[in-house]
Curated annotation (Swiss-Prot):
UniProt binding sites for NADPH: 84-85, 246-247
Entry's family note: Belongs to the GTP cyclohydrolase I family. QueF type 2 subfamily.
InterPro entries, per the entry: GTP-CH-I_C/QueF, NADPH_dep_7-cyano-7-deazaG_red, QueF, QueF_N, QueF_type2
Gene3D superfamilies attached to this UniProt entry: 3.30.1130.10
Natural source organism: Stenotrophomonas maltophilia (strain R551-3)
Compartment annotation: Cytoplasm
Residues bound to substrate: 82-84, 217-218
Pathway where this protein functions: tRNA modification; tRNA-queuosine biosynthesis
Keyword terms of this UniProt record: Cytoplasm, NADP, Oxidoreductase, Queuosine biosynthesis
Name of the molecule in the record: NADPH-dependent 7-cyano-7-deazaguanine reductase
Length: 272
């Protein structure tokens, strides 16, 4: 079984000079899910990992360089996630490759990424538009004392069962760390829910308690979804984290209660 420590993370590597789908490094989702009591066969959520690729280049049949940006969507039901550095190296391996057409490139990306993830991956050229302020109400201005920065403390989460609301709460203060290199991962996280009113100060303390936590982006979002669901008992819940770019890629994991459909229109934040 592949582990993060087996990947190219934290190692010096040569940039590829020719196309090589073998550079893609899959990591099973099951290990991290088992740590928080999740079973791949009975997931309590639906969702996807949406990647934005900013550094995509190849050669046309006559050898002229081409460039594009792309949106890649990996279903959360895939048995494996795609490790980010390997994704970057794979895209770079296309730089000197002649490809017949843009559609041929898209089909190649779909084939290779789907094989890595173990499930059908969607690829479309283009990116969502930028939005200056996220949709929802920021909780970052709350006047609170905070002294816990890890590990994540679900005990901070609470909800008032006497008030049932539907709202979207947003924080730009989510930070976690790569479990291999220790590099910081920065994100704005949004929680849209219907149910008992979540205590905002407790939620902010909870999100800040990820600050020294080491876990991949996708795993952090699944942990947040699971712990908010367990502690606050919403009727339904959506959690999305929009991470800042690294190596020409950013990732946006989205998890939601079964029956919730992904928003038809999404956006990128200024930090992305």
């Amino acid at each position: 079984m592949n582990t993060p420590q087996d990947s190219s993370l934290g190692r010096e590597v040569s940039y590829p000079s020719q196309y090589d789908p073998g550079l893609l490094f899959p990591i099973p989702r099951s290990g991290a899910r088992a740590e928080i009591g999740l079973d791949d066969a009975a997931l309590p959520f639906v969702g996807h990992d949406r990647w934005h690729a900013f550094e995509l280049s190849w050669l046309d049949p006559r050898g002229k360089p081409q460039v594009a940006v792309a949106t890649v969507q990996v279903p959360c039901t895939s048995p494996r996630l795609i490790e980010s550095k390997s994704f970057k190296l794979y895209l770079n391996s296309l730089n000197s490759t002649r490809i017949d057409s843009v559609e041929a490139l898209r089909e190649r990306l779909v084939t290779d990424l789907s094989a890595c993830a173990g499930a059908p991956v969607q690829v479309a050229f283009g990116l969502p538009g930028l939005r200056e302020t996220p949709l929802g109400e920021s909780i970052d201005g709350l006047d609170v004392d905070i002294d816990c920065y890890g590990p994540p403390q679900a005990d901070f989460l609470a909800a008032d069962t006497s008030q049932v609301v539907e709202e979207t709460l947003v924080s730009a203060l989510l930070k976690s760390n790569c479990p291999v290199t220790g590099q910081p991962d920065w994100a704005t996280v949004s929680l849209r829910y219907c149910g008992p009113k979540i205590d905002r100060a407790g939620l902010l303390r909870y999100l800040v308690s990820y600050r020294e936590h080491a876990e991949f982006h996708e795993q952090c979002v699944e942990r947040i979804f699971s712990e908010v669901s367990a502690r606050c008992q919403p009727q339904w819940l959506e959690v999305e984290a929009r991470y800042t770019r690294r190596g020409g890629l950013d990732i946006n994991p989205w998890r939601a209660s079964p029956g919730i459909t992904a928003p038809a229109a999404t956006y990128r934040e200024l930090r992305q």
